[in-house]
């Protein structure tokens, strides 16, 4: 018969290939699929593979002009999710040629661009991605990474301390700079612009940058330590963002910041390249992440957004606090914290890691613990996150009854006490409260903080 066989056909005939052996160059994805009633899981998994690669809803004449076998995504394995009715993990392999080099934007457009609205699925969640070495190598990654940051700041053997300046909206630039100075003077390493501080009528960006730089240099001179303030360069256009980064560089400050999900991956990668070329560290805030990652059965898990950020580039990224959450959360969070920091991470389903990931020497990212934490959490945070992290106490610094500087002192004393105790071989998990209590005996600032935030 001449021509091709027209008409609608089942996806699973072409896109479900259980015998497929995955290649080292394939991008692998693990999707949590919830098919509509009556749709078999193979068909649902194949539909995801098809719609996120070469497929369309019907056979087309132009299929004959290319090699589908070379370019199609393949659903190569399906497993039911324990304890969930009609929910499956579908594993899909994508050939590397489907993706533009060095573009997280294109990677996401391909993998999650279209399929999430698909009729045959009730819900769909991307749980994890395996980025092959060949693709990792097309990205610059973090502007500097953990080791270079430590060298630039001359701070070793402990987590770094930060603080978000509150009230986040409404302060004038001069008062804002004063708050920054107090915190840094008290002993913090960093202070931070809030994610929604960009350039508003009450405080234009240029004024803020100037007063923060002044605060930074004053605190640096008085403490003999290198200080930083994450100047938020996020803006309405890439050009404006780079303009702000350029001004930060001219002021000689060490670090700028970006909201990478609201700003977008294209903007983020642009800024990241600028930061490496100009010696700026880049702090990444994850505003909007919960819109994407909060639903358990639809959207994308944060570990995927974290991996994408490491490719796109950032030196710090917010990654939850673990403290006070559920036990399961702890393992899962530590899973993606390792994915951010380590060079090689083994597959471990108990930690939510679906694939072994080799980062082939791409620099690591420091996880930032931020939100609702205070001095009593310090032992747990030190133990859970280890040295390579940034601990950010917003209210936990500024809420101190005596003011910002004493609040900063309290946090620094608590941290140094925990690090010393750990280095002496004490167990932070069981002796944490006692360690803080002992330290507060010779630090009135810490004692006052302990009083305000009861264990």
UniProtKB/Swiss-Prot annotation:
One of its GO terms (molecular function) is ribulose-bisphosphate carboxylase activity. The disulfide bond which can form in the large chain dimeric partners within the hexadecamer appears to be associated with oxidative stress and protein turnover. It catalyses: 2 (2R)-3-phosphoglycerate + 2 H(+) = D-ribulose 1,5-bisphosphate + CO2 + H2O; D-ribulose 1,5-bisphosphate + O2 = 2-phosphoglycolate + (2R)-3-phosphoglycerate + 2 H(+). GO terms for cellular component: chloroplast. Its EC number is 4.1.1.39. Substrate binds at residues 114, 164, 168, 286, 318, 370. Mg(2+) binds at residues 192, 194-195. It holds the Pfam family RuBisCO_large_N. GO terms for biological process: photorespiration; reductive pentose-phosphate cycle. The record marks 325 as: Transition state stabilizer. Its cofactor is Mg(2+). PROSITE patterns: RUBISCO_LARGE. It is an enzyme of class 4 (lyase). It is found in: Plastid, Chloroplast. The modification N6,N6,N6-trimethyllysine is found at residue 5. The modification N6-carboxylysine is found at residue 192. The active site is at 166 (proton acceptor), 285 (proton acceptor). Binds 1 Mg(2+) ion per subunit. Keywords: Calvin cycle, Carbon dioxide fixation, Chloroplast, Disulfide bond, Lyase, Magnesium, Metal-binding, Methylation, Monooxygenase, Oxidoreductase, Photorespiration, Photosynthesis, Plastid. The basic functional RuBisCO is composed of a large chain homodimer in a 'head-to-tail' conformation. In form I RuBisCO this homodimer is arranged in a barrel-like tetramer with the small subunits forming a tetrameric 'cap' on each end of the 'barrel'. RuBisCO catalyzes two reactions: the carboxylation of D-ribulose 1,5-bisphosphate, the primary event in carbon dioxide fixation, as well as the oxidative fragmentation of the pentose substrate in the photorespiration process. Both reactions occur simultaneously and in competition at the same active site. HAMAP family: RuBisCO_L_type1. Belongs to the RuBisCO large chain family. Type I subfamily. Heterohexadecamer of 8 large chains and 8 small chains; disulfide-linked. The disulfide link is formed within the large subunit homodimers. This is Ribulose bisphosphate carboxylase large chain.
């Amino acid at each position: 018969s001449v021509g091709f066989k027209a008409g609608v056909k089942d996806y699973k005939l072409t896109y479900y290939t259980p015998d497929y052996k995955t290649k080292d160059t394939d991008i692998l994805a693990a999707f949590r699929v919830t098919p509509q009633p009556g749709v078999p899981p193979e068909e649902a998994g194949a539909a995801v593979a098809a719609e996120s690669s070469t497929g369309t809803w019907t056979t087309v004449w132009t299929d004959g002009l290319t090699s589908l076998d070379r370019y199609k995504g393949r659903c190569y394995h399906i497993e039911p999710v324990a304890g969930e009715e009609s929910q499956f993990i579908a594993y899909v392999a994508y050939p590397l040629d489907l993706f533009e080099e060095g573009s997280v934007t294109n990677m996401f457009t391909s993998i999650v661009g279209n399929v999430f609205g698909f009729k045959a699925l009730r819900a769909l969640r991307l749980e994890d991605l395996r980025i092959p070495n060949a693709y990792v190598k097309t990205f610059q990654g973090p502007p500097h990474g953990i080791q270079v940051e430590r060298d630039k700041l001359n701070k070793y053997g402990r987590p770094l301390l930060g603080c978000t300046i509150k009230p986040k909206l409404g302060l004038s630039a001069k008062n804002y700079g004063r708050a920054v100075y107090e915190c840094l003077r008290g002993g913090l390493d960093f202070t931070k612009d809030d994610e929604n501080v960009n350039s508003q009528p009450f405080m234009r960006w240029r004024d803020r940058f100037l007063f923060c730089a002044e605060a930074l240099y004053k605190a640096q001179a008085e403490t003999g330590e290198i200080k930083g303030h994450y100047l938020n360069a996020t803006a309405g256009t890439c050009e404006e963002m780079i303009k702000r980064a350029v001004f930060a560089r001219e002021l000689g400050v060490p670090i700028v910041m970006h909201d990478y999900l609201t700003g977008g991956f294209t903007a983020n990668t642009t800024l990241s390249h600028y930061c490496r070329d100009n010696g700026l560290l880049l702090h990444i805030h994850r505003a909007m992440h919960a819109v994407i990652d909060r639903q358990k059965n639809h959207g994308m898990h944060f570990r995927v957004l974290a991996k994408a950020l490491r490719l796109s580039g950032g030196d710090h990224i917010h990654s939850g606090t673990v403290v006070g959450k559920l036990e399961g959360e702890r393992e899962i969070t530590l899973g993606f914290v390792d994915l951010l920091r380590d060079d090689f991470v083994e597959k471990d389903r108990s930690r939510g890691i679906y694939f072994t990931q080799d980062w082939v020497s791409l620099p690591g990212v420091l996880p930032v613990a931020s939100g609702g934490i205070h001095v009593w959490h310090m032992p747990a945070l030190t133990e859970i996150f280890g040295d390579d992290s940034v601990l950010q106490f917003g209210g936990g610094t500024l809420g101190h009854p005596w003011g910002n500087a004493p609040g900063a002192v309290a946090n620094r004393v608590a941290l140094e006490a925990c690090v010393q105790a750990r280095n002496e071989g004490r167990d932070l998990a069981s002796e944490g409260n006692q360690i803080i209590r002992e330290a507060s005996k010779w630090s009135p600032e810490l004692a006052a903080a302990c009083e305000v935030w009861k264990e």
